[in-house]
A protein has these predicted regions:
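Core catalytic alpha/beta fold that binds nucleotide/phospho-ligands
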Residues: 1-229
Length: 229
């Protein structure tokens, strides 16, 4: 199914200068393979990487967005950390999947994107990824607890991707400190294991889209947000 259009992407791009592409996955893996250039051995690669049909479709949908919508011919490579990158194309890339949706994001600086489908699972697991003071933030907003839990989980995933540091823990090292609802921004403190001080505060933009929440974090997000206002 073609790229999803939503004003939410326009809102978030005011703060983070990137290109966002979405795909509502209604096709089979074979149909998605048929949309990809034959010059790449995607059929063999996806068969070797994934047994699950759902995971195959998520992976292939991102490649369809890359080649058919973003019009980039270069395949995505992966670092040892698991983060995606291009060898030759001068763009940073981040990807995410949730349920039957896929997201591809392209920018000119390191960043992380995440999408998370709405549901009760995140709320049931808050003790695993939110500190007590983070849970208290929901009472200072108009966001419903279940929706806030999904937002918090997604925001921490976006920060983790932007940091590209496998030693970071979502609970211990990434802490949401403030929610600015009018600007749809979160202030998140990141404490690397190598830090001797109090860490850094990064900005995470968010938007509640019809089927999922979208979050986006730049490593230099505070400067980017400040200069975009």
């Amino acid at each position: 199914m073609p790229q999803i259009k939503d004003n939410g992407a326009d809102v978030i791009s005011r703060y983070c200068p990137i290109k966002l592409y979405f795909w509502d996955i209604t096709e089979s893996a074979e149909q998605l393979l048929g949309m990809l250039p034959s010059s790449y051995a995607y059929h063999e690669e996806v068969a070797a990487r994934f047994r699950s049909e759902a995971r195959r479709k998520e992976w292939l949908a991102v490649r369809v967005l890359l080649h058919r919508v973003a019009d980039i011919s270069e395949p995505i490579a992966y670092k040892e950390s698991g983060g995606p990158y291009f060898v030759h194309t001068p763009s940073s890339v981040s990807i995410s999947h949730t349920s039957h949706f896929a997201c591809l994001a392209l920018g000119n600086a390191p960043f992380g994107v995440d999408i998370e489908q709405y549901g009760a699972k995140a709320l049931a697991l808050t003790d695993k990824f939110l500190k007590p003071q983070e849970k208290e933030l929901v009472s200072q907003t108009s966001i419903a607890p279940e929706q806030f839990a999904v937002l918090a989980w997604s925001a921490k995933e976006a920060v983790y991707k932007a940091a590209d540091d496998v030693s970071l823990g979502l609970f211990q090292d990434i802490t949401i400190e403030h929610v600015d609802e009018p600007k749809a921004l979160l202030s998140v403190r990141v404490q690397h294991q190598s830090d001797c001080g109090v860490g850094e505060v990064w900005k995470v933009s968010y938007v509640f889209m019809p089927h999922f929440v979208l979050t986006l974090c730049f490593k230099d997000g505070e400067r980017i947000v400040r200069e975009s206002l």
